[in-house]
Amino acid sequence: MAALMLQGTGSDVGKSVLVAGLCRALANRGLRVRPFKPQNMSNNAAVTIDGGEIGRAQALQALACRTPPHSDMNPVLLKPQADRTSQLIVHGRVRGTLGSGNFRAGRGALLPDVLESYGRLRRQCDIVIVEGAGSPAEINLRAGDIANMGFARAARVPVVLVGDIDRGGVIAAIVGTRTVIDAEDAAMIKGFVINKFRGDPALFDDGYRAIAERSGWPGLGVVPWLAAAARLPSEDAVILERRADAREGRRIVACPILPRIANFDDLDPLKQEPGVELLMVPPGQPIPAEAAIIVLPGSKATIADLAALRREGWDIDIKAHHRRGGLILGLCGGYQMLGTRIADPLGIEGAASEVEGLGLLDVTTELAPAKTLREVTGTAWNSPVAGYEMHMGATVGTDTARPFARIDGGGGEGAINAAGNVIGTYIHGLLASPALRSALLAKIGVAGNGRDHGADVDAALDDIAAELAIHIDIGALLRIAAHPV
């Protein structure tokens, strides 16, 4: 069994996309491939085939491998709830809540969990493609590390270092990494890849050679800016692009960017609809009055994010939109916010508390320790819907008598107000269902294009894989992967 780990000179250098692309390129060669990320920090999570949860980036990488996502692919997941507090997920299950200092001090104890998952994956496939987190150059975090060199050395997995040339300073980033890490860690690195290059790569030939000479590592490729990456689900950052008016007569779908926004890739299918403009509203900006739909997204800290929403004055914008008869869709945490009350008697999100909701749905929510994790199928608005639930607590009330969806093998799910313009649901991913998305857009006079979002993502993975096959020496990567360090 072979294995290869991609580590970066920093965060956001494109490791996740490169891992996904390599997974698809190798799967296209007929290899059995599995993705692996020892430790991830993200509030964007996916439900796994074994009933757990992992980072959505690893779920995308599993799709690239043409295999179902499994909790072993991301054994340690941190989901930030506050600036210094995160929910700890191990093997897909909640293990508790940790402060940042506690995690740094105790993360080394999670290495056996990480190696256990990695060992199971190894036995299932021909090659594992591993993604690091942050950078091995963060030597202040080296003690107890399980995300980068701590894992690589324990599992004897060779490393390729990825540098992002688009942000500038890639020569210093790679050579600087070689300078600050110790000799044993440096020996794990078997080459480097330049990512996100724009223009003629021949212009970087001198720089490419200089990196190889100064680092002692061979170059394994220069990857161009991958336009197809924009067609993949969002992972850790929302593009804060705001326009005052809809372009070319498009109707605006507005979504406020909450501090602990979660699973915001729920909205990605709207980006491919020519009749709408998806507007992510950043703090400090009002939700525009011309919005046709307001979406309240998921949240990892519903009560705190509701307070933040009120501080921004977005509650005023939302209620004004409601009075005008505008459509409002609440997803998961956003659904909870639309109710009359949210109670957290056990302090799931922090101190025990009870707060007033926006009062646009006659429902109440009580948070509880048990987490609902399941994939669902059903019907809504006479259209098939498929997605997943991932929440803690239950929502009850009069408006649940008008459910948003009927779940196969179950009852009603979600709630709709009497006027029919306020909708709440726990189903993530529902907008990827073409008929359901078209039914929603029909309510604002827009014809949906009926495109299959999943097929578009799959095609993007193939496009990225084809680019990597041209610009990276995949044969060299396979030779490196075949020899444990």
UniProtKB/Swiss-Prot annotation:
InterPro entries: Class_I_gatase-like (IPR029062), CobQ/CobB/MinD/ParA_Nub-bd_dom (IPR002586), CobQ_GATase1 (IPR033949), CobQ_N (IPR047045), CobQ_synth (IPR004459), GATase_3 (IPR011698), P-loop_NTPase (IPR027417)
Pathway noted in the entry: Cofactor biosynthesis; adenosylcobalamin biosynthesis
Active-site residues from the entry: 332 (nucleophile), 428
Biological process per Gene Ontology, one example term: cobalamin biosynthetic process
A Pfam family: GATase_3
Any one GO molecular-function label of the UniProt entry: catalytic activity
UniProt keywords, alphabetically: Cobalamin biosynthesis, Glutamine amidotransferase
Domain GATase cobBQ-type per the UniProt entry, residue ranges: 250-436
Keyword Secreted: no
SUPFAM superfamilies: Class I glutamine amidotransferase-like, P-loop containing nucleoside triphosphate hydrolases
Homology family: Belongs to the CobB/CobQ family. CobQ subfamily.
Biological function: Catalyzes amidations at positions B, D, E, and G on adenosylcobyrinic A,C-diamide. NH(2) groups are provided by glutamine, and one molecule of ATP is hydrogenolyzed for each amidation.
Protein's name according to its UniProt entry: Cobyric acid synthase
Organism, as annotated: Sphingopyxis alaskensis (strain DSM 13593 / LMG 18877 / RB2256) (Sphingomonas alaskensis)
